[in-house]
């Protein structure tokens, strides 16, 4: 084990504070509509320009190990807030720095760190309760656009795109952000359920221009096993042909005699048919087939459930308004399943998402949820240069996370106003001693810091004056840093998701409390470069005398 370096009490906290301040000072310049960009050097390629707090925080590594520990603790505030709420990372960093700074002053003056932390925790609990009280539910497209605009650093185009996407695919729909090949940023929506499986044979194509198979009002056969024997499939084919409607087959695979017979019947015009492989693998495939069955009102023909393909009847088949299949994807529009069954399935998947501990599983469950809920929207980001594209894509992703958070828990007045109004909740705190009371006052002072920093970034107004003026106001009265005017923030479209504000405060207080109660810091002693063994001299030792051979 390598030797360790240890610092205690005030010495440890002072070093940690230097690290906290270095990271926070780099991050907080990005806060608010007047926030500045940070340029980050990359070992490969062009530097990255960003106004995203968590991106800045993740790039910071300090040379001094003790300072770096402080910086990494605050980086944790930023990344945790980003993971949970998707935005608010800079606000969280500013709050953490303010709570730690004020707390350190009091620890140096003789306050007990543990009681300070307890006071801070009690205060945060009451402030969050007050935030929930003043929060308003979000419903309209305009409000969603406002949240997206603010989170995208006041870019109304991005706010409107996200509002359009949410309107088309619903609040549970999947919205993905991709890089466009051109310079235009645009929204593309795929309605219905789409999965990444194309036709098994190009002979199934009905539209030779688009090279896709379009089935109107088809029956849908869903089978979880491979189909290779024609006699198993024949009974249901005959019943479908008699009805005169097209047939869509989704199964593990179709091969040999069965596939050849389907192609021949399609070419002869006996039966309008198309076949695709089932999406996914293993247990996820079973779940997705069940989703398709519920969406279309059909039954998965599975021997595990006691159903056999040769005994299948029309009642086993699902139905939809249209099914479109190209070489890569299958899209089912307006499945004719029972609304109550679909709703129950959606709730079941939501419960699985809540219980999931894996990011990958959660992502796949959310995709399934979206496909049942109404569709997938893709925002294609266009820009002139790669640097601009990456910066814009990061802003769109932030804005998307923020709007989802707003839909979940509502919105509060933005621009740091909500935190100042929520300070009213501190009157309900019952501290057990003077040090806990001091902890409450630390939070009261810290709640003003985001507004103070937003104003500082404008570079034109005194933050202390603005904070006092806002504190004298009521409701959503605040300072709009973009126009540099005092006005009602909600009417001006300056709003924040409640979840973002809440998460930022919770995480900031948690990490600041840990830092305040730290009494020792331990790190590896860095080995000096001079301790490395000397390299042997150049050439091949012992062969110097060979020079006389020339």
From Swiss-Prot:
Q: In which residues is ATP bound? A: 30-33, 51, 87-91, 415, 496
InterPro entries with a match to the protein in the record: Chaperonin_Cpn60_CS (IPR018370), Cpn60/GroEL (IPR001844), Cpn60/GroEL/TCP-1 (IPR002423), GroEL-like_apical_dom_sf (IPR027409), GROEL-like_equatorial_sf (IPR027413), TCP-1-like_intermed_sf (IPR027410)
Tell me where on the tree of life, at the top rank, the source sits.
Bacteria
What UniProt keywords apply to this chain's record, in alphabetical order?
Answer: ATP-binding, Chaperone, Cytoplasm, Isomerase, Nucleotide-binding
Q: Provide one Gene Ontology biological process annotation.
A: protein refolding
Query: EC no.?
Result: 5.6.1.7
One Gene Ontology term of the molecular function aspect: ATP-dependent protein folding chaperone
Q: State the residue spans of region: Disordered.
A: 528-550
- A Pfam family annotated for this chain is Cpn60_TCP1
Q: Where in the cell is it found?
A: Cytoplasm
Q: Name one GO cellular component term.
A: cytoplasm
Record field: catalytic activity: ATP + H2O + a folded polypeptide = ADP + phosphate + an unfolded polypeptide
According to the record, the segments passing through the membrane are none
Q: Which CDD domains match?
A: GroEL
Q: Does the keyword Acetylation apply?
A: no
Gly residues bias spans = 538-550
Instruction: Enumerate the PANTHER family for this protein.
Output: 60 KDA HEAT SHOCK PROTEIN, MITOCHONDRIAL
Extract the NCBIfam families matched here: GroEL, PRK00013.1, PRK12849.1, PRK12850.1, PRK12851.1
Q: Tell me, what does this protein do in biology?
A: Together with its co-chaperonin GroES, plays an essential role in assisting protein folding. The GroEL-GroES system forms a nano-cage that allows encapsulation of the non-native substrate proteins and provides a physical environment optimized to promote and accelerate protein folding.
Name this protein carries in UniProt? Chaperonin GroEL
Biological source species: Chlorobium phaeobacteroides (strain BS1)
